[in-house]
Amino acid sequence: MRTIGLFLIFLVVNSPRPSYTAYPQTSILQGVRFVSPDGRYSVELREIDRLSYYAIEDTKTGDVDHSVVMPSLLLYLRWAPNSRAIVAVEHIPHGSCGRVVYLTDSKWADIEVRPPGKELKDSAVVGVTIKADYVHYRFAVRYIQPNGMPIRYAFCDLDVSLETRVISNVRWTPTSRVEWATSLEQKPVYNPPKA
C-alpha cells in the first residue's frame, strides 16, 4: 500500500502542467529604466529593505518617490501618453493583474486592476491597450468552486480612466475552456499608445 501511495505522489508531482504564455517565466528586472514621453519622469524597480518599489524620479528636480510598492514580479510597464501615469501588468498567484500608477497632487499613488466581483476566480491579463485618456485591460477568467474545481470561463474587458482612475465599461463574455486556454497560450497583446 505504501508503494502505491508513493507512486501516486510521484505521479502528481511529476505530471506535466500546461505552460501558458500569459504566465511568463521572465519579468522586468530591477534597474531597467523607463523614461516618460515628455522626459520629465523616469521609473525603475528598486529593492529597499527586501521589498521592491517603483522608484519614480523627477528628472527636473532629481527627487525620487518610493511610495508605491511593487508586490510581485513586473511583467509589463509602459508610460501613458500624458506622462502622469504608468500602466503595468504584475504576476499574482494563478495569473496576473493590472496596475495603474499615477501622479496626483505631486504624489504617486496606484490602483490595482482585476475583474470585479466577489466570486472565487483566477484571472490573467491577455491584452492591454493604452489610449490618450484611458487604458483597456482584457482578462481571461476562470471561476472556481471552493474546492478548486473550475466551473466556468469568461473574458472580462474593462477600461481605467487615467485621470480619475475609475473603472468603467466592464464587459463579460462567456467562453469555453478551450478558448480560455488558447488565450493563455498566446503571448499577451500589449498595444502601446500611438505616437
Residue spans for each PLM region:
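Acidic, small-residue rich beta-repeat scaffolds with periodic aromatic anchors
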Residues: 5-13, 20-34, 106-195
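Structural motif
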Residues: 50-55, 94-102, 145-158
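Beta-strand-rich domains and repeat architectures in extracellular enzymes and scaffolds
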Residues: 25-52
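Short coil/turn segments that connect the beta-strands within blades of beta-propeller domains
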Residues: 39-40, 82-84, 133
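A short beta-strand motif characteristic of beta-propeller blades
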Residues: 63-68, 110-112
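Beta-strand C-termini and the immediately following turn/loop, strongest in propeller blades
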Residues: 44-49, 88-94, 99, 127, ...
